[in-house]
């Protein structure tokens, strides 16, 4: 019996350690697969409507815009996320009864940030928008598919010389930049689907952990995740929940 127990224990240890010991694709190969997966969606623009929730200092921005405070001090407000590829992402709050000109907004255009004072000065909202743009609004380079992704990750401080495997949201993921337990800049991609699922980086003095959850959901499909979360200090600070995603809507250039 003791021998059987030892064998079972050894098998369990091997199963847990398997991701660390598995074959690792070269980073350029991973990024090429990521680029191909996103390019297969055929997206030039994307509109995602839903609800944004925030706690702490970020909740004040929602309350000032007409949001409601729920249990635990969390504020909530309808919102819209629009993307124009390459490199333009806009988060817009949608208070009831507010005209288009009155709606608070935040725009990330390449590395530039602009928008309403309250949102543009909040590093957590900026980090959420910047990570979304980094992971969902990359251009396609047919000649070198990995290059736009490598450049975007390098801008966020992710080392392109180290990689590992880790587990995220119940699935195995490629971890670019180091080990899964590191708190330095890392980019995570689902091992099987090659969808982006997590980005750790620094926005100003804020250590941001942005998570893209629930790919393939009825609300977002393969175009957008079910939710985008911003964690700081191990706690959830902002969450955008997708209610509807629309591929390639006609969006005015003026909003970007």
Give the positions of each predicted feature.
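Bacterial N-terminal signal peptides that target proteins for export
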Residues: 1-11
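Gly/Pro-enriched, hydrophobic low-complexity segments
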Residues: 97-99, 165-256
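Short, solvent-exposed coil/turn linker segments
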Residues: 3-4, 139, 251-252
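Flexible, processing/modification-adjacent segments and terminal tails
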Residues: 23-32, 41-42, 108-184, 202-203, ...
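N-terminal mature ectodomain segment of secretory-pathway/periplasmic proteins
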Residues: 21-120, 159-161
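Subset-of-secretome marker
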Residues: 57-82, 91, 117-142, 151, ...
